[in-house]
Amino acid sequence: MKITKVLVSCDSHGDYASMFPLVHKMWKSICDYDCIAIYVGTSLPAVLENFKNKFPDSVILYKPLPNIHTTFQAQCIRLLYPALMENETVLISDMDIVPLKKQHFVELLDSYNKENFVTYTDR
């Protein structure tokens, strides 16, 4: 299995948006994966707006649905958005997780095909 994209998401709660430049850089430099952030909010914070100007396909703004907490929306969209990414093999991750070892996220997947669902948790 060859991952083609990593997907992370966040909203305005916490400092998660400010982590994305490092998260994007680490996924690319360690695993050679392109990382995309989905931000749930009415507008992008400056850090993501600036990043989007450099890497237009790396940041997506998702306007929040009314009466549903944006943190919950960010969690759900990260799980559901890959269904819209045709012809991609997507690894979903938390915004505050960066790869430290290529073997864990690249070589470990070599024995799987794109029809498999692989989880890195025991839940």
Predicted stretch roles:
Residues M1-N67:
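N-terminal anchoring/stem segment of glycosyltransferases
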Residues L100-R123:
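Conserved donor-nucleotide/metal-binding helix-loop-beta segment in metal-dependent transferases, i.e.
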